[in-house]
């Protein structure tokens, strides 16, 4: 099968087979709402046409798409349908080109919509002419196509453990980013050559099953079993979890340092924002939803619910606390202003209480409507448990001293409310209603 359109149709059905129309309506509605908010942001910030030519705009588009595609494709290779795809008479090049279109619609568009709205907004208010608008839309579209194809290529080399090719293409991409900053005239030709390399040379050989288990996975399976080690094993072997956590920690550090330099917020507010950003990192919070395929086995085994919960909580809270501590140390060292003791305790309370709430919410209302991990990571339901954490951050408005007492009390009330809800991961008395 060499026709890209039937393959694309199959891939979309794989993602949206159960609730295709509802998902399409949900995506369209989400894009409209996002567009309205971004237009309001552009107006509020007074962004003009000078921003279009800034280097950081192109770099942000390239890096954002590459990151999201890398995350999606590495997760995709863990799904059973990929093994079947490797056996079917499907053109590898056609498959990955079709997958690139699917990734743009399902993953990249809502995260890079700003780059397409900005020229249209400037055209609407008369700042850009029609020709200029088409130029910038074409330019952003070109870099979007390049970054998606590059992300597919890089992630496949990573999954298949072709380290030399991975480093080679990463070096080419780094040169593309440098050329965007220092030699803009060669950026587009260089991207075009790199895209041709991906489509002509690499894509035809990518539809092959990768190696199965890493050395770390083998070691963890041989060691004495524990749920705590099992969570670490899943985290280390899951590129989606690992990369999302690292990127969120790096973004939190960069964001806090920039806000501290500009003086927009004081130090305490910045560290609270860091806590909120780390806590919103959803892949490591869905520790019950991810157990969908092993749920019945875990229910039938003689396992105490509390034992499993505390193993997951130790892992989750440890990751959050470790990430915050690392960011706080780096930001404090660079800025020369270390975090105060009260602010540190306040942020630890937020993270530990938030982790407890998110994990409890996921246990009581797990999301089982996904067919592939890619659907779980990209779905809007992953933020549902985060909403229960918002009262904790509202408590910080009362001041540090008061919030230190209010945060644990608020967390206990929220957890008590969640525990009183019907259903849950271990409830077999009812059908799996959630997400189905």
From Swiss-Prot:
Protein's cellular compartments: Cell membrane
Chief place of localization: membrane
Signal peptide annotation: none
Entry keyword set: Antibiotic biosynthesis, Bacteriocin biosynthesis, Bacteriocin immunity, Cell membrane, Membrane, Transmembrane, Transmembrane helix
Entry membrane topology: Multi-pass membrane protein
GO terms for biological process, alphabetical: bacteriocin biosynthetic process; bacteriocin immunity
Annotated Gene Ontology cellular component terms: plasma membrane
Residue stretches spanning the membrane: 27-47, 51-71, 112-132, 134-154, 166-186, 187-207, 240-260, 270-290, 315-335, 395-415
Purpose: Involved in the production of the bacteriocin subtilosin. Required for immunity to subtilosin.
Protein name per UniProt: Antilisterial bacteriocin subtilosin biosynthesis protein AlbD
Source organism per UniProt: Bacillus subtilis
Taxonomic lineage from the root: Bacteria, Bacillati, Bacillota, Bacilli, Bacillales
């Amino acid at each position: 099968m060499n026709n890209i359109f039937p393959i694309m149709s199959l891939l979309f059905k794989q993602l949206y087979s159960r609730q295709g129309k509802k998902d399409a309506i949900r995506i369209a509605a989400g894009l409209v709402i996002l567009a309205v908010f971004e237009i309001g942001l552009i107006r509020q910030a007074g962004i003009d046409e000078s921003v279009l030519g800034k280097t950081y705009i192109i770099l942000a588009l390239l890096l954002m798409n590459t990151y999201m595609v890398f995350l999606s494709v590495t997760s995709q290779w863990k799904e059973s349908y990929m093994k079947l795809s490797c056996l079917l008479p499907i053109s590898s090049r056609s498959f990955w080109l079709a997958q690139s279109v699917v990734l743009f619609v399902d993953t990249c568009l809502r995260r890079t919509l700003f780059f397409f709205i900005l020229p249209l907004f400037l055209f609407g208010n008369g700042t850009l002419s029609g020709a200029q608008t088409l130029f910038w839309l074409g330019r952003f579209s070109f870099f979007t196509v390049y970054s998606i194809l590059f992300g597919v290529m890089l992630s496949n080399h990573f999954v298949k453990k072709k380290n030399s090719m991975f480093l080679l293409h990463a070096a080419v991409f780094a040169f593309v980013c440098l050329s965007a900053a220092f030699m803009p005239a060669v950026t587009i030709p260089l991207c075009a050559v790199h895209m041709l390399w991906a489509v002509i040379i690499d894509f035809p050989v990518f539809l092959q099953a990768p190696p199965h288990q890493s050395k770390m996975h083998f070691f963890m399976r041989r060691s004495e079993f524990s749920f705590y080690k099992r969570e670490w094993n899943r985290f280390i072997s899951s590129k989606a979890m690992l990369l999302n956590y690292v990127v969120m920690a790096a973004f939190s550090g960069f964001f806090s340092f920039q806000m501290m330099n500009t003086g927009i917020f004081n130090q305490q507010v910045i560290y609270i924002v860091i806590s909120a950003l780390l806590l919103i990192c959803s892949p490591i919070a869905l520790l019950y939803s991810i157990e969908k395929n092993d749920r019945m086995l875990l229910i039938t085994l003689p396992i105490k619910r509390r034992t499993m919960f505390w193993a997951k909580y130790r892992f989750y809270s440890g990751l959050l606390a470790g990430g915050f501590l690392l960011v706080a140390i780096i930001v404090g060292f660079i800025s020369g202003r270390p975090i105060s003791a009260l602010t540190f305790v306040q942020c630890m309370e937020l993270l530990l209480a938030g982790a407890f709430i998110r994990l409890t919410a996921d246990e009581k209302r797990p999301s089982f409507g996904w067919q592939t991990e890619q659907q779980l990571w990209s779905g809007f339901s992953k933020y549902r448990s985060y909403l229960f954490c918002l009262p904790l951050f509202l408590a910080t408005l009362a001041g540090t001293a008061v919030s230190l007492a209010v945060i644990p009390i608020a967390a206990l009330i929220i957890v008590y409310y969640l525990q009183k809800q019907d259903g849950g991961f271990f409830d077999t008395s009812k059908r799996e209603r959630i997400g189905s």
